[in-house]
Amino acid sequence: MVFRLANFDFELPPDRIAHRPVRPRDAARLLCVQTSGGCFGYQPDHVYHGVRPCSGHASSRPGHETGGDRKNPQDARLTQDSAQPSNQLPGDGRNLARIEDRVVRDLPDLLCPGDIVVVNDTRVIPAQLTTRLGNARIIITLDQPRAEGTWHALARNARRLHEGDKLRFDGPSDLSAVILARDLDGGVILRFDQQDAEFDEALRRDASLALPPYISRPHGPEPADATDYQTVFANNDGAVAAPTAGLHFTPALLTVLEARGILRAFVTLHVGAGTFLPVRSDDVSHHTMHAEYGEISASTAHAINDARAGGGRIVAIGTTSLRLLESAVDASGMIAPFAGQTSLFILPGYRFRAVDVLMTNFHLPRSTLFMLVCAFAGTETMRAAYAHAVAAGYRFYSYGDASLLYRYDR
């Protein structure tokens, strides 16, 4: 099947790009999008045959309207087609999709006791280094470690670099490396002279956060970014970019989720710099997905499987958690322990086996992440939902608002 890159394009005004997060974090807006239920009381059919949705949810019968006492008073109205009800979007195949404008702190009202939210506990490391070759300033962004103390990295002005070049990086630590190899996508393999604890300390002193290129920081990251660009779950060093859906959570929100009987599990996927690389193939099925290292412990796999067996939905917080879970699931929907690289590339037509609900930020046009949400909730549904988000003033990308999506193939 041919998937044209242009099919995943959309117009995004520059003023919709968020350059700083809202405060508090859980005050960010949350766009619920579902085809056969979800924010309106959806329960997965593999568990809830004939069982009434949990308390506080409206019926999942087709055409049932959301409860007025729970509707956001700031509800934005669709502008694409005035003939459609304000909470309906074009659907993919069987059903109309419906939306609801909420805020992140409403999440406990949108989930049920026994659901399990799966969060990525990776911690962002300072990974951007600068050096000079002659008069040229070279920016190196570490991507992921390789064998024997080497790193794969992305290099700006990579054409100036050659195998065997010795790089001495700016900063007080005298950090240095030699280029072992180059690849065609601006990547290099580096061997640093410093190793282990000495290398980690040098990074802390000499490197800066590798903020996404769409976040405007003319003079580099600001002091607030050191905390703003980490999730409350951050525990395991290794990511170059934040798992941004997790940025919306606060201790207060977690307390309410726990009090409602909503479970939580931790996985680790170290988000690499490759997440920022554009898709260059017109037929996107030819795109080579970057690999990232992830882990799911045996206890986490057991907790997720138990939640599903007990009737709970698997709620992935972010595309990183989703891709890792889908990399570790078998044909029956059981999660196995996992430790290794994943380069799973999800396009429309993919059959999801692990995840029922996805919370994720709003993504770039033509990106692999927008392709993923189209696969999860339906391409036409997501194109219409993003058009609604633009018209309603939602904030996009890493520091922006979030969406709550439900698998339309159920």
Ranges and model annotations:
Residues 32, 65-66, 70-72, 76-77, ...:
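N-terminal low-complexity, intrinsically disordered patches enriched in charged
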Residues 63, 80-83:
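N-terminal polybasic/positive-inside topogenic patches
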Residues 47-51, 58, 65, 76, ...:
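Short hydrophobic alpha-helical segments enriched in small aliphatic residues
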Residues 42-48, 69-75, 81, 87, ...:
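Intrinsic-disorder-associated, low-complexity terminal segments enriched in Asp/Asn/His/Tyr and depleted
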Residues 1-38, 95-410:
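Surface-exposed, charge/polar-rich loops and edge strands
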Residues 13, 56, 80:
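Short Gly/Ser/Thr- and charged-rich N-terminal loops/segments
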